[in-house]
Swiss-Prot record:
CDD domains found in the cross-reference section: PQQB-like_MBL-fold
Sorted UniProt keywords: PQQ biosynthesis, Transport
UniProt keyword annotation of Glycoprotein present: no
Domain of life: Bacteria
Protein name, per record: Coenzyme PQQ synthesis protein B
Lineage, top ranks: Bacteria, Pseudomonadati, Pseudomonadota, Gammaproteobacteria, Pseudomonadales
Function: May be involved in the transport of PQQ or its precursor to the periplasm.
Pathway where it operates: Cofactor biosynthesis; pyrroloquinoline quinone biosynthesis
Length: 304
């Protein structure tokens, strides 16, 4: 299984266009040793020819340009994107579908709750129906058998319901439903390699831990270092837990969780622009290094 990190930042990217926090100001000025990042999305493939997008970032055009395998140029109009899986209906995970409209029709796998959001509160399916067949919904059923995407038959995918939040625009924002957010457990049937992918992870129960223990690689929510980070940085008033994100530090945080898992590789993705782990010289980044936890970056490649 080939995994390409197209984007590794949370919504807004890094630096965020309107943010002058320590991190954003420092990376613009060149005084902070950090790598700019686009908004989170990954691509996966069994053979490296056809690729499945997991989430469609607002930065998808730049991400395609940065990863030539997605534009193989075999004919006048071409793409290696053969399917799209949405893990939620957050704006930073689905707005890229608008940029991909010239390539419609696209097969889009998502849960019924995500499909509802994207036909009501943010009706992308409705809007794009006017472009050559638009988005063709393929239902992801929860607690069902694993599924495969025809273009990459060597990958078997399990969808796992997560405890997190629907987007702010969702009609049921304050009333969470199973399927608002999912994680993916992906297995390569040829190599046996396994990936657990959950860029938005708010709570972890024993059932979810069972999936995480089975994975060779964990690619999980790295949004915030501390739960009150937005307040401390004076850029917002919400806690990470209120937004559906488990912070890294402290009792019950992501570091403690990952320390208890046997996985060979543990990687954080969906990093918010305020998170001190973006600073390569920060004590927080050193703490991750000491625990054997990696931080995803744009252009990172993983083979399982």
């Amino acid at each position: 299984m080939q995994i390409q990190i197209l984007g590794s930042a949370a919504g807004g990217g890094f630096p965020q266009w309107n943010c002058n926090c320590r991190n954003c100001r420092g990376v613009r000025a060149g005084t902070l040793r950090a790598q700019p990042r686009t908004q989170s999305s990954i691509a996966i493939s069994d053979e490296g020819e056809q690729w499945i997008l997991c989430n469609a970032s607002p930065d998808i055009r730049a991400q395609i340009e940065a990863f030539p395998a997605l534009q193989p140029a075999r004919k006048l109009r071409d793409t290696a994107i053969a399917g799209i899986v949405l893990l939620d209906s957050q704006i930073d995970h689905c707005t890229g579908l608008l940029t991909l409209r010239e390539g419609c029709p696209h097969q889009v796998w998502c849960t019924e709750m995500v499909h509802q959001d994207l036909t009501t509160g943010f009706p992308l399916f409705n809007m794009l129906s006017h472009w050559n067949g638009g988005l063709q919904h393929r239902l992801i059923e929860l607690d069902a058998k694993p599924f495969s995407i025809p273009a990459c038959p060597g990958l078997r995918i399990n969808a796992i319901a997560l405890r997190s939040s629907a987007p702010p625009y969702s009609p049921h924002r304050g009333n969470p439903h199973p399927g608002d957010n999912i994680g993916l457990f992906i297995e390569d049937l040829r190599t046996g390699g396994t990936l657990f992918y959950a860029p938005g992870l708010g709570q972890v129960d024993e059932q979810l831990l069972g999936w995480m223990r089975r994975a060779d690689c964990l690619l999980v929510d790295g949004t915030l270092w501390r739960d009150d980070e937005m307040r401390v940085c004076e850029v917002g008033d919400k806690l990470g837990s209120e937004m559906g994100h488990l912070c890294q530090s402290g009792p019950g945080g992501m570091i403690e969780l990952l320390d208890g898992l046997p996985t060979a590789r543990k990687i954080l993705i969906h990093i918010n622009n305020t998170n001190p782990i973006l600073d390569l010289d920060s004590p927080e980044r050193a703490e991750l290094d000491a625990h054997g936890i990696e931080v995803a970056f744009d252009g990172m490649s993983i083979v399982l």
